[in-house]
């Protein structure tokens, strides 16, 4: 009974939760049913407290659904039960194995002869069966999913399954180091893996400009056009670098149109929303929005922890949960910063032979942590929010309850919880001596509104970017 009941719960939770969240917190739980009491065993106190805090209501709801009137009492314990609980089957390693395929295939993905790069270049048709510059290490299987990138990942998967027909073009935008480039490569690899003769080209926008200049210098612009207009998928990173390059924009405009007419996939990334890219023609910006435009947000706490745990696992390093949380709570801006910090911690541990503890991390990252703590303060958050919403600081800290003041105040409280290490009572004190329960309510309300309101989600993301830059 316990096996089938908990397996039902696991399967439903796996459907409802981001994969990184499920794998980290729910999958390790074991279950035992005795005397109508369902005991869930967690590997340590940290996981137990987290599960009970975050998922208790969801688990109780599922038990109510599956058991009707005969609902078992739910208990939590640290440890493991005598007999192993059934596990949800893990994803296969087929995609990961593909990343270590034959050297010839790797070379084909990473290099390609471009016929306009030398004088007297001939037709390009013979050179099109390649996977140009697609990095085989970046797959969907090693992309850590979270609420911040869930829509972007889902769209990228759809495009890789149906290139040229689902979301064309796909435009991903967001700050530096959030995973946009990883998704570009993942799409390229997925297309190539399902169709080995697909012609997929990944490049930075500056490389497109450089290629066009070489083609003009070598009197080979027609070869350049045929090359780029004959690919099955064109993946261009950092499209904002086309700004103020009129000839490049002109050529890309015609290439863009030709690819769309041929149902060939286009994926673009930028550090900002298409209409906010200065120096790019309106006709191009309009076309960028013809398909699907998706924001990639800075990772939330749970995703940052999952990223650290995944990277530590890749390095075959054990990283304790509390250490991962210590790092994730203090480094919030992007994935690249997290990975760089973890690499520094691992290098220091290897050099010194010391265990990776919170004290060790505090020492290894002291300059980085000091900078972060100096950059983001509650006072800074309050001033930024007040300026963003064009309200007075005095009103933000007052007892006024009108929505024009209360909502920015709640946002500022939620941001203070997210971006600083202050406790709820300390945050409450900073907002006019409010109780910690008021701060907790504000955090929960903003979390709810970010799911329901596009405007609140956009405001929150804009403020995060401003405060983290």
Swiss-Prot record:
Role description: Plays an essential role in the initiation and regulation of chromosomal replication. ATP-DnaA binds to the origin of replication (oriC) to initiate formation of the DNA replication initiation complex once per cell cycle. Binds the DnaA box (a 9 base pair repeat at the origin) and separates the double-stranded (ds)DNA. Forms a right-handed helical filament on oriC DNA; dsDNA binds to the exterior of the filament while single-stranded (ss)DNA is stabiized in the filament's interior.
Q: What ranges does the record give for the region Domain IV, binds dsDNA, renumbered to this chain?
A: 350-469
Q: Which family does it belong to?
A: Belongs to the DnaA family.
- Recorded protein name is Chromosomal replication initiator protein DnaA
Gene Ontology CC annotations of this record: cytoplasm; plasma membrane
Query: Which organism does this sequence originate in?
Result: Aliivibrio fischeri (strain ATCC 700601 / ES114) (Vibrio fischeri)
The record, for InterPro entries, names: AAA+_ATPase, Chromosome_initiator_DnaA, Chromosome_initiator_DnaA-like, Chromosome_initiator_DnaA_CS, DnaA_C, DnaA_dom, DnaA_N_dom, DnaA_N_sf
Q: Which SUPFAM superfamilies match?
A: P-loop containing nucleoside triphosphate hydrolases, TrpR-like
Cited HAMAP family: DnaA_bact
Domain comment from the record reads as follows: Domain I is involved in oligomerization and binding regulators, domain II is flexibile and of varying length in different bacteria, domain III forms the AAA+ region, while domain IV binds dsDNA.
- What keywords appear on the UniProt entry? ATP-binding, Cytoplasm, DNA replication, DNA-binding, Lipid-binding, Nucleotide-binding
Q: Which gene encodes it?
A: dnaA
The UniProt entry's GO biological process terms, in alphabetical order, are: DNA replication initiation; regulation of DNA replication
**Which Pfam families does this one have?**
Bac_DnaA, Bac_DnaA_C, DnaA_N, Hda_lid
